[in-house]
Amino acid sequence: MQRFWYGATVLNVIDGDTIDLMIDLGFDIHHKIRVRLYGVNTPESRTKDLAEKEMGLKAKSFTKDWLTNHKWVFVNTIPDKNDKYGRILARIYSSDDVENTTTACLNKDIIQSGYAREYFGVGDKTWAEFKKETK
């Protein structure tokens, strides 16, 4: 399976697992996309459940900080994969040097930080169920 890599500029962080990006397609062609972090689920930041909302805002803050603290951002798209809302599924990598050597992966880092969990779209559990399992 061939994957595609694009340089990107962050436009907006929607929540912990969704980002608006301007991707560089080359030849001075740019395209705005909404990306869902592949394999990642964060709590909702727009919910009436106050505990989940608090965690969702922390996850969003983590994502913003991660993107701000890395100089170069790259998108590794998952071919022919969109979520049910039409968002592109992708892994987000960063590099801190001009050689574009990837040094970190947002998808992995947000899960390891405890602000997200792995998710591949099947048998999703609520955050309350997930929290009980991790205690």
Regions of interest found by a model, annotated:
Residues M1-K135:
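Small beta-barrel nucleic-acid-binding modules, primarily SNase/OB-fold domains
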